[in-house]
Amino acid sequence: MVNLSGDEKNAVHGLWSKVKVDEVGGEALGRLLVVYPWTRRFFESFGDLSTADAVMNNPKVKAHGSKVLNSFGDGLSHLDNLKGTYAKLSELHCDKLHVDPENFRLLGNVLVVVLARHFGKEFTPDLQAAYQKVVAGVANALAHRYH
């Protein structure tokens, strides 16, 4: 559950309606893989991830980033039940993929950076604070199976 005021919810949803999921998702996942290179081990089947340029231009990274961001968008519609919304993804990432749950927090923070880059002054400190609450809630929900 994410506790947002009515104004925060409106602001989060308002900005999200402008997000180009394919573009932002690919960039967010790509930046995660570049900034935190140990995360690449989960994506070895994606081909060349040897350089920042290779990662950022990799079509499989872009496609998976889009998939991840679509899932994030689904969560925005269920802020009062994120654990239920992400229960199956939490199980997959914990039991089958063995992803360190810290990576969910890292990706959330990278997403906030990418949103700030794309939206500039429109991404105000108050909006950032609201998105930080959301990405923390999503990361917590995805890590739920680990507890």
Curated annotation (Swiss-Prot):
Domain of life of the organism encoding this protein: Eukaryota
Keyword list (alphabetical) reads: Acetylation, Heme, Iron, Metal-binding, Oxygen transport, Phosphoprotein, S-nitrosylation, Transport
Single GO BP term:
hydrogen peroxide catabolic process
Binding residues for heme b: H64, H93
Task: List every position bearing N6-acetyllysine.
Answer: K60, K83
Positions carrying S-nitrosocysteine are C94
According to the UniProt record, list the residues that bear N-acetylvaline.
V2
Q: Which PROSITE patterns match?
A: GLOBIN (PS01033)
Q: Which residues carry this modification: Phosphoserine?
A: S45
MF terms from GO for this chain are: haptoglobin binding; heme binding; hemoglobin alpha binding; metal ion binding; organic acid binding; oxygen binding; oxygen carrier activity; peroxidase activity
Show the Gene3D superfamilies listed in the entry: Globins
Q: Which family does it belong to?
A: Belongs to the globin family.
The entry describes its oligomerization and partners as:
Heterotetramer of two alpha chains and two beta chains.
Q: What is known about what this protein does?
A: Involved in oxygen transport from the lung to the various peripheral tissues.
Q: What is this protein called?
A: Hemoglobin subunit beta
Per the UniProt record, the source organism is: Lama guanicoe
